[in-house]
UniProtKB/Swiss-Prot annotation:
It is an enzyme of class 6 (ligase). It comes from Burkholderia vietnamiensis (strain G4 / LMG 22486). One of its GO terms (molecular function) is ATP binding. L-citrulline binds at Y99, N135, R139, S192, T201, E203, E280. This is Argininosuccinate synthase.
Length: 445
């Protein structure tokens, strides 16, 4: 039997991930009128653009929900965000600027915690606002079924009857007004925004055009650093890690990591730190574009990466980066709790993060412009006296280096022989003005 229901299951409990916005409000009331028994579940993810979470379940009851619950997901969200940071689970970058996978992390937390709450209430049918062209429909599908194998999926936006009756925001607003709720449709923005405590995503509408840039976005976690009228003073900040966990900002220790990340958001946000413009591949392989904010994670990541490079050796760092990119893709695809992801994540947390203890001082300026001012750690393997150009006691002598270079003759000879072979088979041609062979063009010239 299919786990996806294409029509409303009347007379049955249907859980809906309820944001309180127009779409989910109209869907909930519509389901009630059509004979379903809707239950509303709201995730408190610390969204920076939401100021009254307690009012959301009350609105759900008003619109016809048989039950409504507010689930505090903030601690779990921050824990998963720090786990992603420790693992370097970020695969989308442009010219060194990183997207911190904040929406995929949020979906992992929401998809598991809301379905767990539904299961407690005997609700085994789940709906949410994700569309069939996006990533979230698959992420929620995977996480929901991981938690509840008996789960069925009903999405109003996949139900043709719902689409025919309430196919757009204007129709939804009129539907709510006719029902007596005086629901005013919010002003249309030039793009869509989704956010949580870790970061914000701006996409769709005008941002689908690559001719529209970051300047049309109004940041919700920071400042528009590209505007000349926005005054931003340089600021020094210290970040301290202990055994891979961020514990202090500017010398102030935080026992609660949610509070630490909120403060990191405030500090980074004052500069517009962590904003990026990315073109990415969705799960279905089509390309999309997003403008992202993550001021707090960006601040922590600068300090964490600095300590990683000062503490670990080259091969460990290489493996950390390669595995981090693989893990980032798994996270993006909704596989954060799959065995292969857990294996990569646990390895990084155990063998990379646990050694990360120290303090980094950073000067923040505008946007992603910053300088590292100092790095301190009892675990540093960076020891400048080993390579000092000054006359100091050295760990090896000139004769030692001569011997090491002499050993290189073997692989240099091998390389020269291989280049000769490539020239003989026509892959290379002798260069006229160079002692090295040149690669031939496809035309043979």
């Amino acid at each position: 039997m299919s786990t996806i229901l294409e029509s409303l299951p009347t007379g049955q409990k249907v859980g809906i991930a309820f944001s309180g916005g127009l779409d989910t409000s109209a869907a909930l009331h519509w389901m009630k009128l059509k004979g379903a028994v809707p239950y509303a579940y709201t995730a408190n993810l610390g969204q920076p653009d939401e100021d009254d979470y307690d009012a959301i379940p009350k609105r759900a009851i008003e619109y016809g929900a048989a039950g409504a619950r507010l689930i505090d997901c903030r601690a779990q969200l921050v824990a998963e965000g720090i786990a992603a940071l420790q693992s370097g689970a970020f695969h989308i970058t442009t010219a060194g600027v990183t997207y911190f996978n904040t929406t995929p992390i949020g979906r992992a937390v929401t998809g598991t915690m809301l379905v767990a709450a539904m299961k407690e209430d005997g609700v085994n049918i789940w709906g949410d606002g994700s569309t069939y062209k996006g990533n979230d429909i698959e992420r929620f599908y995977r996480y929901g079924l991981l938690v509840n194998p008996d789960l069925k999926i009903y999405k109003p936006w996949l139900d043709q009857t719902f689409i025919d009756e309430l196919g757009g925001r204007a129709e939804m607003s009129e539907f709510m007004n006719q029902a007596g709720f005086a629901y005013r449709m919010s002003a249309e923005k030039a793009y869509s925004t989704d956010s949580n405590l870790l970061g914000a995503t701006h996409e769709a509408k005008d941002l689908e055009s690559l001719e529209s840039g970051i300047k049309i976005v109004n940041p919700i976690m920071g400042v528009a650093f590209w505007r000349d009228d926005v005054k931003i003073a340089a600021e020094e900040v210290t970040v301290r890690f202990e055994a891979g966990q961020p514990v202090a900002l500017n010398g102030v220790e935080f026992k609660d990591q949610v509070e630490l990340l909120l403060e990191a958001n405030r500090i980074g946000g004052r500069h517009g730190l962590g904003m990026s413009d990315q073109i990415e591949n969705r799960i279905i392989e089509a390309k999309s574009r997003g403008i992202y904010e993550a001021p707090g994670l960006a601040l922590l990541y600068i300090a964490y990466e600095r300590l990683v490079t000062g503490i670990h050796n080259e091969d460990t760092i290489e493996q950390y980066r390669e595995n981090g990119r693989r893990l980032g893709r798994l996270l993006y695809q909704g596989r954060w709790f799959d065995p292969q992801a857990i294996m990569l994540r646990e390895t990084a947390q155990r063998w990379v993060a646990r050694a990360i203890t120290g303090e980094v001082k950073i000067e923040l300026r505008r946007g992603n412009d910053y300088s590292i001012l100092s790095t301190k750690s009892p675990n540093l393997t960076y020891q400048p006296e080993r390579l000092s150009m000054e006359k100091v006691a050295s760990t090896f002598s000139p004769r030692d280096r001569i011997g090491q270079l002499t050993m290189r003759n073997l692989d240099i000879t091998d390389t020269r022989d291989k280049l000769r072979v490539y020239a003989q088979v026509g892959l290379l041609t002798p260069g006229e003005s160079s002692a090295l062979p040149q690669i031939k063009s496809d035309s043979g010239e």
